[in-house]
Amino acid sequence: MNRREFFGVTLLGLTRKSGREIVGGFVHDTAALGHRLRDGTRFPAPQRTQKVPIVIVGGGIAGLSAAWRLQKRRAEFVVLEMEDSTGGNARADRNDTTAFPWAAHYVPVPGPRATLVRELFEELGVLESGAWNERYLCQAPQERLFLHGRWQEGLEPQVGPTRRDRDQFARFEARVDAARATGQFTIPMALGARPSPLDAKSMADWLREERLDSPWLRWSIDYGCRDDYGARAEATSAWAGLHYFAGRERQEMGPLTWPEGNGWITDRLLERVGGAVRTRQMVYRITRKGRQWSVVTPDREWQADVVIFAAPSFLASRVIENGPATPDFEYSPWLTANVWLDRWPQERGLPPAWDNVFFDSPSLGYVVATHQSLRTFIPRTVWTYYWALDRGTPRENRIWLLTQRWQTLRDRVLADLSRAHPDVRDCATRVDICRMGHAMIRPTPGFLTSAARHQLTAARDRLFYAHSDLSGISIFEEAQYRGVTAADAALRAISG
């Protein structure tokens, strides 16, 4: 179903007059700011110069993780963030009822190889004496799926698949177990990834080769690819498609989550490094001057010994003198919406879960911000709704997303929610929408082995790249790993 067909069908449910207007608008809308870099806008020359050993460009999780590492090593640094707040995809807000996320909203319980995540979580009290703090483990019920007009437990379809479909689910799980056993599908991915022929083909092609053609299985795999990559199986490398499943333990006790999602981690990192963070500082030029780097913002020129570039890698060619091109880097656009509800909508089937998914919907569903509350009853709540624009090319979808009116997108969100909650419009008071044109990297076929990716992962003259897009996987663990390893490289460069 394309966008036009989707609007034609779902907006039928919103043609009646509502008793009240649902307010809201676009939030964290920084496309115009970023496009100044794209369009080569001339900026005023800075009037001040300041020296610092290390400059971190970008205040998302990668940049904040680099700062966390440097702070622990007592290094001097500054973090320059273009927007008015840090966190990137791990950003959050709050109303009178609850905090709520704008994108990243959980971290799977990290396995033994995710040592950096475990170190941080021990410091934050999430991991205590080897045990996970139950306060942060997602409470039951965790997931439900809206299918055939009712909610069912879990995300694997229960009603509809035949014995043949079930056999294919079992065969696929066996393939995942075999992939996991190779040790090449790790988190962080750099610890295990090796050149693989799986990277040369799409996940859809691999499924055809394996004769896994169940439409129910295909929906589940598409959902996984959309969830982590913002792309369907046709546009995802088979290596990355398998990594979504094989990179985690088969039996997990998590995930770890908070009302504000990964914004909770952002806040904890800022408590430690916030004094070195400078927001509203657009870095528009980075050049080499003798033995130092010149990092220029409209406010001032920073002279640094080392630069950690933790902004999205596609910006390198626009900002860094002779910066590398990134033709293989594709980014998925996303829409997220926070729907404020002054009462709970009607339910059909199971009670609300933390993660609520609609079968065969363009969206990925919604999470409930108040799910972790210890109160027995909360009359109001906030639902965070996720839509990865995965039909058509990323560029086409970005243009479409940025040209839509807020009212049109608001009605689209409510229409999708109304398939399971017919009275949602009567319960909603506000819908705020965040448009993210380059929300996450797409690991397209060939990306893992691409020359552009390998060029960026190699050190270059005291400039180290640190964004999660270097992994091809836009998740917290990868962003943290890239930030910390870049910080370690920066420390070695300075001490050497």
Model-derived features with residue positions:
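A short, charged/proline- and glycine-enriched loop
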Residues: 48-54, 380
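Conserved flavin/dinucleotide-binding core of flavoenzymes
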Residues: 15-43, 148, 154-157, 346-496
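Glycine-rich FAD pyrophosphate-binding loop
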Residues: 71-93
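Active-site/ligand-binding neighborhood in enzyme catalytic cores
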Residues: 181-285
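N-terminal secretory signal peptides and thylakoid transit peptides that target proteins
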Residues: 1-13
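Mid-domain catalytic core of redox enzymes
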Residues: 279-384, 420
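N-terminal Rossmann-like FAD-binding beta1-loop-alpha1 element of flavoenzymes
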Residues: 52-79
